[in-house]
Amino acid sequence: MVGPNRVFLEYIGNVLPSLGERSVQQRTALDLCVPKVDVTGVDDNETRRWKGSEEMLARLVEASTAHVQVLDDDLKVPVGARTFTFTRAELSDWLQQALAGSLPVNRRRDSLKGLVQRDLQRRYDRDDIWDKAPALRAALTSMWPTMQPIRLVDRLLPGPGGKRRRWTVADQFLVDEANSLLVGPPFTYGHVVVDEAQDHSAVALRCIGRRSPGRSITILGDLAQSTTPAGQREWNDVLRLLGASSADGTAEVAHLTIGYRVPAPILDVANRLLPFTGVRTQASRSVRVEGVEPLLRMASDADLAASVADEVKLVRHRHHNTGVVAPEALFPAIAKALDVVGLHAVDRVHDLGHLDVPVFHAEAVKGLEFDGVVVVNPHEIFDGSERGARLLYVAMTRAVQVLHFVSSQPLPVELTP
């Protein structure tokens, strides 16, 4: 089971065991990556998009053999009293034969060794001749040095390298891709379930696809909730990156349009955002026709945080499981205001105390649900990025009972009928 983030996995962590299923491993996509790097850096949105793109996949393929080069001159190899000459043309031909193979790059290097070794034995007619030709072995190492995945990615990326590099999450997925190109397939599973699949980059989807060589994969997602910089906009692209296709029968796409979680009065308003998400998707309809339409509480900028705290107390009076979705810049003020009314802002959904209130930004709340949701400054979420309509859609559809807005400005006109 591959979830979008650690908070989500903690949220659903007890679901399968409660059903008697204890053999399923629950991971984030990042957990699947090998070999590991120490992730301490953070990319900006444009860099995340670039590093997660198919362009980077192509650049990695090119870089994986860029260090392989034929010698400048013919190679003379002394063996005992004799000297054998391997012409540059011969070496180049063997090199191209080895490179043309389909094995991982470091194993194709062994193919080059086999071609040269066979020719040397033909010339000298002795089985131990390879051991007596250290100059030849050194020359082959010079032509085709062994490359390690972390070093390959370090050389490919801009910025300070080596020990000075601050690796990021996107870099870790590139290292996993490099490992596949150089070393070969990683550990695998019999079946993989991927939730929130639309948020994964092209490079991350490749990482997930390799974990099921037989392409036994179930993916779930909503393109209208694709909120990451390198996320997906077409299911056909997702399938292709996983190594499957609906066109050739190796995959089947089922559109689920009946909702059981979000009440119709909330979902109908959220669906007004779909034309502005930039993706092709079908609006869902809820079987829960009863419910309350979203409510708006206006507040000045100066009173915004205090109004949020008051609204949370009001919603919690009937719905203890209440969460806040807000722009991250407002977190400190909201936390302080919650403290004033005797509540505590937390960034988790497990092991909650009676007075704890989860507070998240829209991207982090993906996959979670609350009986009551308080969305702060929806206009700021909507206008904050090109993904704003999708982020606001995510925020609104976390509510399974009531949705309240607290805002210093009117709701985005896109939410009006």
Go through the PLM ranges and name each one.
Residues 4-48, 177-191, 198-417:
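Conserved helicase motor core of SF1/SF2 NTP-dependent helicases
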Residues 1-193, 198-207, 215, 224, ...:
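Alpha-helical nucleic-acid-binding subdomain
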